[in-house]
Amino acid sequence: MLSKFKRNKHQQHLAQLPKISQSVDDVDFFYAPADFRETLLEKIASAKQRICIVALYLEQDDGGKGILNALYEAKRQRPELDVRVLVDWHRAQRGRIGAAASNTNADWYCRMAQENPGVDVPVYGVPINTREALGVLHFKGFIIDDSVLYSGASLNDVYLHQHDKYRYDRYHLIRNRKMSDIMFEWVTQNIMNGRGVNRLDDVNRPKSPEIKNDIRLFRQELRDAAYHFQGDADNDQLSVTPLVGLGKSSLLNKTIFHLMPCAEQKLTICTPYFNLPAILVRNIIQLLREGKKVEIIVGDKTANDFYIPEDEPFKIIGALPYLYEINLRRFLSRLQYYVNTDQLVVRLWKDDDNTYHLKGMWVDDKWMLITGNNLNPRAWRLDLENAILIHDPQLELAPQREKELELIREHTTIVKHYRDLQSIADYPVKVRKLIRRLRRIRIDRLISRIL
């Protein structure tokens, strides 16, 4: 059993977090990507004071164009609006994985700026590390006036369900002046005005090697840049705590670590990529040993955004969903006893050829973590991540919380035995060969740390 002292240490961490009081009527849950798109467009069109869009990317496709056009239109209608977009510096200047870097998102931002003279919608490129593989802007949240529309989604056709296919995420709108001010000021001070951050809608922007030293210093500064605010809520009322972090010792990571053992009945986790840091796996095993329930909802390998159908040309990146499945199979084989007793429930999400991008945690009925953090080594060490921790001690959000989980579970099947998952021997020949080659040179471990 977890000693009283240790449990108190975890609970103490949560109790001491500064909390901002939140009205239950000012929290909206959305349950589908199309609703998220419509809400975002409505909020942009009705904004009175500020629009700050932060995302990994804003893609040059129908979905992304709809958003950028709406931002230009809002600025044209109300020139006094403070409108800004922040995306990852490296991601914006390359093609999609496996495609050449011609006509990139950054080129599109430049064209939009040239086609709209006198309408300033700055797009800032944020370099979290000198190379994309070593860290990206994974901070989430669209701050519009006194609201934060929060999702792990980026902005493109599938995330916005612009056409047939969708990528499933979580979507919440929180109206809270204090929290939106804290997030807006932090983004302005620590990201927008950060060294190494340059406008992508400027054709004369520097090349990455020219700002390498600035990027390194910027990353160092971000490690120490937490939100600083006084809470105004106690531990008995509905509250929100914004969190931000870069690096394994961040307050966000510490909070995730302390949140899990506070489950008295049940912990539920969603992640699209099953590659949990060892420290979180230990937390899960400890909960199971104490008789607590753990539910993990992950995407089926075919619902992974890196999955390549067998009838399409194979690329190395297409091995990733199989590596995640190997991780899950290994995890389940260790814990099959708890699967047999229904104490550990693992669900695989699959809905036709749509993809799964959900992340977050639910601890009992009282805590909810909404985040873009994939709960993997990459999120733990390399990317700039953030989250909003919701404390609901009076269960005021219970109906929405239950509905959200019910809908997430709708397209899932429960894994009853680790052998229900394919083993390497069952994989397509090219995948099998690649994985065995990676294992021979021990590079699979390195890959798991950066993916």
UniProtKB/Swiss-Prot annotation:
It catalyses: a CDP-1,2-diacyl-sn-glycerol + L-serine = a 1,2-diacyl-sn-glycero-3-phospho-L-serine + CMP + H(+). Changing Y57A: Does not affect enzyme activity when serine concentration is saturating but reduces significantly when limiting. It is a peripheral membrane protein. Changing F306A: Reduces the enzyme activity. The active site is at H138, D169, H357, E385. Disulfide bonds: none annotated. Changing R94A: Reduces the enzyme activity. Residues 27-224, 239-451 form the PLD phosphodiesterase domain. Keywords: Cell inner membrane, Cell membrane, Cytoplasm, Lipid biosynthesis, Lipid metabolism, Membrane, Phospholipid biosynthesis, Phospholipid metabolism, Repeat, Transferase. NCBIfam families: PRK09428.1. This is CDP-diacylglycerol--serine O-phosphatidyltransferase PssA. The gene is pssA.
